[in-house]
Amino acid sequence: MNELELLGPRAYGDALGRAALKATAEDFQVDEVLDIPLSGDGEHLWLWVEKRGLNTVEAARRLARAAGVQLRTVSYAGLKDRQALTRQWFSIQLPGKADPDLSAAQDATLQILKSGRHKRKLQRGAHAANGFTLRLTQLEGDKEALNQRLETIALQGIPNYFGVQRFGYQGGNLGEARDYAGRKALPEQRAVRSRLLSTARSYLFNRVLAARVADGSWQKAQVGDLLAFTDSRSFFPADVDECSDPRLAILDLHPTGPQWGEGPSPAGGATAALENAIANDESVLRDWLVRAGMEHERRILRLPIGRLTWHYPEPDILQLEFVLPPGCFATVLVRELVDLVPVGQTDSPCVF
């Protein structure tokens, strides 16, 4: 499957040119934003780690080996890309133990920048945001048009699609999910099961969002919508009054789409009709998610791009700096600007 089939239409028209992303790790930098002050004592050693050419799980394994502990005692807030320069937190549970010598874990691909003790382990999804610095190289495009589109995006946001990396190479993860769903089976391995269930939910969400981008309603509240704030997992129904809430205009409040689970869509009106129609069209995937015990959740349809700035350090390089909530994909911003020339892979996303 191609990108258009896995995601959906762009919000602002065709790509404005071509560029390469991830020609080097420095072209895709991610800094985890964590608003948790460390207590200075406790059985958990927290580590601020810079890594390149390593995904999060590989880094965790290396830290576990160096510390002489089992992998399950190493925790992290979210998964970060392999083909990137990333800085994120890890914690290691060390009850009654001194800080281990972790020099064996460090080399040109992994450096521990700072450390500290805390009373609790690092929980999945505990980070507040991810900060990105992207360099689009080999740029071919009209800078004036790119600047205008970036200004529009800064004011209006972008569709909050799950990026193609969620679906694997050419949508292979979705093919696997369909195979298991068709057999009414679940993978035995927990990691594989989680990956394929997430893929199926993401695809159903993207289909709903694609339909709303196509009809122009992705950033507008309509009666029957379920609304949510940018950083909240809770939601509430939209009536006539809520549809004119001024917080919609300033990108604090957004319509949401389904993360499918048990029961019909909790939305109402035209929103429920659309979501249930897509779920019925993909009934094999929907029923598979329900049998797996997934709970119905919501995800904002519109993604505000925090602190968006850009400049051109070289005539053929566009550098973007911005902040996204956890679970959102930097590559969907790039997609609204340019087509990518194949260079590096967008491996594993920031999914938590």
From Swiss-Prot:
Homology family: Belongs to the pseudouridine synthase TruD family.
GO cellular component: cytosol
GO MF entries: RNA binding; tRNA pseudouridine(13) synthase activity
Entry annotated with the keyword Isomerase: yes
EC number from the UniProt entry: 5.4.99.27
Protein name: tRNA pseudouridine synthase D
Keywords assigned by UniProt, alphabetized: Isomerase, tRNA processing
PROSITE patterns: TRUD (PS50984), UPF0024 (PS01268)
Keyword tRNA processing: yes
GO biological process: tRNA pseudouridine synthesis
Catalytic activity: uridine(13) in tRNA = pseudouridine(13) in tRNA
Gene name of the record: truD
Positions of the TRUD domain: 157-303
Function: Responsible for synthesis of pseudouridine from uracil-13 in transfer RNAs.
Taxonomic lineage from the root: Bacteria, Pseudomonadati, Pseudomonadota, Gammaproteobacteria, Pseudomonadales
Active site residues according to the UniProt entry: 81
Highest taxon above the source species: Bacteria
